[in-house]
């Protein structure tokens, strides 16, 4: 194992780079994992970029619901890209290191985009509430200006929260081991490596994660409570079917994303929890961003129509 590179500050040395252990230390599995996660990443990039392109070029998809979906696709793409390239390089490299600065940057974007996605999913639930419970007021209430603010709000709040959390991480001192038992720079394993008092950082992490997780989930649950009441009051079976169909994809995405993150953050950073968090992290870092475009397009006639329209246009142009 490589010795930690250190920078002398005062009477002690500071770690200037970390070693990422990754998912496994078995060398025979590294090439297989490289191929697996490369395929997942290519599907993620293709699916989310494709969703954004379809929404951009098809006028039928220029509605609030699809603007929010395009924003979610952008988040998922950035979310996965923050971790995957470095992880793929490490699968084929003997030197699985990441600099202290790069580690902080990865931490920052991870936290920022997780919190942003919390509230983007909440915004999408609110949009469904407005469409189903207030259909006559939907166009006026969900104007272009309102949509821009509803998209910008989660981004601004998420990236400011990420900056605050990263500043607390920056204040930690790392002067011992530099081995991170994870495949990316995550707060729990970093906290375990710190040789300074981590109480403030741990408290901040649990408060911020707990508040944003519960607050955004509360918005989603309240929105769907009113949606359920509105659906049960519908006399038309076809109307109820369409309403459930509209909400089904979002509910699946919410369950996958929130379920895995809830398991991740409600536990203290112990040896066992870090090992478990690596498995859980695979789902929300790779599986969820890959599945979201599929989930949202599988039963969506508008998206499928836009896709085949684009395919026919390209085929006929040749």
UniProtKB/Swiss-Prot annotation:
GO terms for molecular function: G protein-coupled receptor activity; olfactory receptor activity. InterPro entries: GPCR_Rhodpsn, GPCR_Rhodpsn_7TM, Olfact_rcpt. Disulfide bonds join 103-195. It is a multi-pass membrane protein. The chain crosses the membrane at residues 32-52, 61-81, 106-126, 140-160, 203-223, 244-264, 278-298. GO terms for cellular component: membrane; plasma membrane. Belongs to the G-protein coupled receptor 1 family. PANTHER family: OLFACTORY RECEPTOR (PTHR48018). This is Olfactory receptor 5M5. It comes from Mus musculus.
């Amino acid at each position: 194992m490589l010795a930690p590179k250190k920078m002398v500050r005062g009477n002690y040395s500071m770690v200037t780079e970390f070693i990422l252990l990754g998912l496994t230390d078995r060398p025979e599995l590294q090439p297989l994992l490289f191929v697996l996660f490369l395929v997942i990443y290519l599907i993620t990039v293709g699916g989310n970029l494709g969703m954004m392109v379809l929404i951009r070029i098809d006028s039928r998809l220029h509605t609030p619901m699809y603007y929010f979906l395009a924003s979610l696709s952008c988040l998922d793409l950035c979310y996965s890209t923050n971790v995957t390239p470095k992880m793929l390089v490490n699968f084929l490299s003997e030197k699985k290191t990441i600099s202290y600065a790069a580690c902080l940057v990865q931490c920052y974007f991870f936290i920022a985009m997780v919190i942003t996605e919390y509230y983007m999913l909440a915004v999408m639930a609110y949009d469904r509430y407005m469409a189903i419970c207030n259909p006559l007021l939907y166009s006026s209430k969900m104007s272009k200006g309102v949509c821009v603010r509803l998209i910008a709000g989660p981004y601004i709040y998420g990236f400011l929260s990420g900056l605050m959390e990263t500043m607390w991480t920056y204040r930690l001192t790392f002067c011992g081991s530099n081995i991170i038992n994870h495949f990316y720079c995550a707060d729990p394993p970093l906290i375990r490596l710190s040789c300074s008092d981590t109480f403030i950082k741990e408290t901040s992490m649990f408060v911020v994660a707990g508040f944003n997780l519960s607050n955004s989930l509360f918005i989603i649950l309240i929105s769907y409570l009113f949606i359920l009441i509105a659906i049960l009051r519908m006399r038309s079976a076809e109307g109820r079917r369409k309403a459930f169909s509209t909400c089904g994809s979002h509910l699946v995405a919410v369950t996958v994303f929130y379920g895995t993150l809830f398991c991740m953050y409600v536990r203290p950073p112990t040896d066992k929890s870090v090992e478990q968090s690596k498995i859980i992290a695979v789902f929300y870092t790779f599986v969820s961003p890959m599945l979201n475009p599929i989930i949202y397009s599988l039963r969506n006639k508008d998206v499928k129509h836009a896709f085949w329209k684009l395919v026919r246009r390209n085929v006929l142009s040749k």
